[in-house]
Amino acid sequence: MEILIGLLIIAIGAFCQSSCYVPINKIKDWSWESYWVVQGVFAWLILPFLGAMLAVPSGHSFFELFDGYGFNVAMTMLFGVLWGVGGLTFGLSMRYLGVALGQSIALGTCAGLGTIMGPVLLNIFFPEMDALSSLTFSVILGVVVTLIGIAIIGVAGSMKASSLSEEEKKAAVKDFNFPKGLAIALLAGFMSGCFNVGLAFGEDIHFGTFTPDMFKTLPATFLVTVGGFITNAIYCFYQNTKNHTWSDYKNEEVWSNNILYCALAGALWYSQFFGLSLGKGFLTESPTLMTLSFCILMALNVVFSNVWGIILKEWKGCSKKTIGVLIVGIIVLIISSFLPQLV
């Protein structure tokens, strides 16, 4: 029962993340770089900090979390910086492929590589932990099934690209460009997988038994997102200067509206990793699902992003065969979430 609760919590977080680009559409008269960094303040700084505070028991301070973990803190933030590159290209992948296809390819690559890279790199720096032992047959099977589901959705995307006229493509996704979007999405997925590597290096940054299991991942999440914010802020401020868009922040007419929707987008985005931490607290009896939890989250993100893609009519004009292939891919991804537990 606890495993089902854990998976349900992760699924709710995935649904929220897949919805985070909906409020962004309500932002008015701001350039991409302006709203991206502002929503990042909420998604990558404020909310993760508040989440990390939940891991601090009464009588202790926030900074005590990091005592004796200097190397782990540095590595966690470093992979956060690398993940930030993935976050930037992630947004571009959706620009050229749409929410459904862009998230599908990027998150699929992220799910597979993120799950495997964590134990591999952890084993290099801390061989005594024997992190590779976590990559069991069940875990690899879960990753493979997830990638199969992603590949099927990718086929649906390719079918969509070849069947629609240029006018129909632009109507669904304004800047649709499948080859360019595919390359960017694969890069985004590889770099985004660094998030889970960061979590692996920061998995011991908590107060042990004094921190409830469901909050133990939150300090590492905060460090990763701080690293990611640094990357994104540098790029966005560069774009503000290049495009002369610093005035966006002074536009009082849209300030309250845009801050509201940036905060909402940030909260929805952060929900996935808050939910991941809470969900893992219910999965402690299953080492396989603990290792696969990040992959499961990414798979469910893909499922819900495609649901949003259908709602937002990004698949409008596609044949029934294309939609059928898409649905098969979604079903395979749903199966990948619980299949390893049955093996």
List each model region and its residues:
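Polytopic alpha-helical membrane proteins, predominantly small-molecule transporters/carriers
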Residues: 1-343
